[in-house]
């Protein structure tokens, strides 16, 4: 893979361009405005990628700094003054960073947390307010956003089928089931209980044997996904195979869910048996249902809620 080369000298005015934002933190009933757009914060911003810098922070002989990732991109030349960078660490700036507390970068999406500088990255990688990645598995889609955006994106850009209701009944047909390559066959989105769920069905190699797998993902966080249960069933010729479990959150990648085998897995010989006929064509009908587990606030007993459709 080729690395980007940065040949132009960056103006000081561009380096120190302010990125104004603020957050609030409650202390003893009073609201404190946190405004990290200070000179110290700006010093910790890499002039090349504009991200916050973390150790090792590099500097040239004239004191211009940049992050370790961008150091390799500029071919050991300072992007500000063009002097050779060498291997000089800016230890003073690294030490100053230890004393800072900054808002989460998802403050504008609702996160009001304030974090020590060196803990901020870890929080942001797990922040409940961070955008969701596109759950479509047929391509490496880079789209991110909230659930409303992703539902529209799946419908309009990926042409995914949309259904309302908590039951599903789908038929999957393949003309030559003996030729199975890793491929996503279908993704369907269901809306029920005011939430969205993605039903995946695909074929892939499990060891030396081809298998078919169906599983459900919840379009939301894991804590909310635990409120729901789903069942899947496939059958034919007087036999059936069932699965019941909790949908995984779309925070877990499609590959992670698939590789954990957390769903209905159908071996090829069983899939052909369910298909009937001369076993030269795959004809699988997968049915299922989603329901919600709610706890009665008075008795503490879990109540199963089924939707009307």
Curated annotation (Swiss-Prot):
A zinc finger (RING-type) spans 46-82. Coiled coil: none annotated. Zn(2+) 2 binds at residues 134, 141, 153, 158. GO terms for molecular function: transferase activity; zinc ion binding. Changing residue 64 to Y: Abolishes ubiquitination in vitro. It holds the Pfam family Sina_ZnF. It comes from the Eukaryota. It is found in: Nucleus; Cytoplasm. InterPro entries: 7-in-absentia-prot_TRAF-dom, E3_ubiquitin-ligase_SINA, Sina-like_RING, TRAF-like, Znf_RING, Znf_RING/FYVE/PHD, Znf_SIAH. It is an enzyme of class 2 (transferase). Keywords: Cytoplasm, Metal-binding, Nucleus, Transferase, Ubl conjugation pathway, Zinc, Zinc-finger. Its EC number is 2.3.2.27. Residues 96-289 are annotated as: SBD. Zn(2+) 1 binds at residues 104, 111, 123, 127. Induction: By auxin. Induced by salt stress. Pathway: Protein modification; protein ubiquitination. The RING-type zinc finger domain is essential for ubiquitin ligase activity. Belongs to the SINA (Seven in absentia) family. Homodimer; homodimerization is essential for its function. Interacts with UBC28 and NAC021/NAC022. Interacts with SINAT6. Interacts with ATG6 and TRAF1A. Interacts with WAV3. Interacts with FREE1. This is E3 ubiquitin-protein ligase SINAT5. It comes from Arabidopsis thaliana (Mouse-ear cress). The lineage of its organism: Eukaryota, Viridiplantae, Streptophyta, Embryophyta, Tracheophyta. The gene is SINAT5.
């Amino acid at each position: 893979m080729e690395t980007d080369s940065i040949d132009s000298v960056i103006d000081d005015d561009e380096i120190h361009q302010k990125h104004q934002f603020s957050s609030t933190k409650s202390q003893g009933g009073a609201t404190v405005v946190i405004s990290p757009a200070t000179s110290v914060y700006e010093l910790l911003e890499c002039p090349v990628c504009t991200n916050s810098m973390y150790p090792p922070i590099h500097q040239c002989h004239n004191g211009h700094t940049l992050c370790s990732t961008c150091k390799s991109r500029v071919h050991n030349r300072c992007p500000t003054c063009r002097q050779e960078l060498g291997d000089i660490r800016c230890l003073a700036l690294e030490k100053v960073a230890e004393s800072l507390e900054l808002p989460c970068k998802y403050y504008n999406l609702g996160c009001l947390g304030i974090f020590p500088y060196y803990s901020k990255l870890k929080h942001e990688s797990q922040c409940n307010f961070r955008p969701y990645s596109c759950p479509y598995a047929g391509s490496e889609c880079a789209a991110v956003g909230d659930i409303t955006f992703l539902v529209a994106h799946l419908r309009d850009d990926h042409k995914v089928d949309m259904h309302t209701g908590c039951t599903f009944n789908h038929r999957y047909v393949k003309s030559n089931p003996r030729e199975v390559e890793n491929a996503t066959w279908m993704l369907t989105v269901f809306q029920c209980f005011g939430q969205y769920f993605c039903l995946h069905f695909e074929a892939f190699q499990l060891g030396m044997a081809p298998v078919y797998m169906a599983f459900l993902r919840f379009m939301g966080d894991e804590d909310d996904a635990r409120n729901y249960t789903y069942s899947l069933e496939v059958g034919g010729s007087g036999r059936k195979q069932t699965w019941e479990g909790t949908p995984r959150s779309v925070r877990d990648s499609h590959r992670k869910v698939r590789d954990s085998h957390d769903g209905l897995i159908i071996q090829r010989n069983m899939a052909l048996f369910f298909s009937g006929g001369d076993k030269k064509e795959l004809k699988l009908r997968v049915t299922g249902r989603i329901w919600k587990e709610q706890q009665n606030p008075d008795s503490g007993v879990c109540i199963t809620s089924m939707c009307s459709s």
